[in-house]
């Protein structure tokens, strides 16, 4: 299983994934933190991306995912990471730590972490 950062979900929906990212996604089941859905909604609201959350494509993608809720353990872990970022990124990274699943991300701060399990 792979946990996806928001940037990977958006690139997947807009056709911007690399061949390596596509290969990883095709070989694993997929999960996201529930805060990814909030981040996507905010980016749409701010007109930074153009996606339709009601589209058949988005609903189909969502039905194939495991969505992890923010738990007390994930919230605690988000404060014990070896990097500082925006709260959503910290929750996403902490989800990977707590659930012990690699995170697929392009975020440089997270990629430099020694704590967060990363997709290779």
Stretches with model-predicted labels:
Residues 8-12, 31, 67, 100-105:
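Short, hydrophobic beta-strand segments that form beta-sheet elements in well-ordered domains
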Residues 57-82:
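Acidic catalytic patch
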Residues 9-10, 37-40, 75, 110-111:
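A generic structural signal for short hydrophobic patches within well-formed alpha-helices
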Residues 1-32, 44-59:
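Short, well-structured N-terminal submotif of metal-dependent ribonuclease cores
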Residues 5-6, 40, 78, 96:
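Generic structural signal for small/hydrophobic residues in well-ordered secondary structure
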Residues 93-120:
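Acidic, PIN/NYN-like endoribonuclease modules and their adjacent C-terminal/linker elements
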Residues 6, 72, 89-90:
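Conserved glycosyltransferase catalytic-site signature
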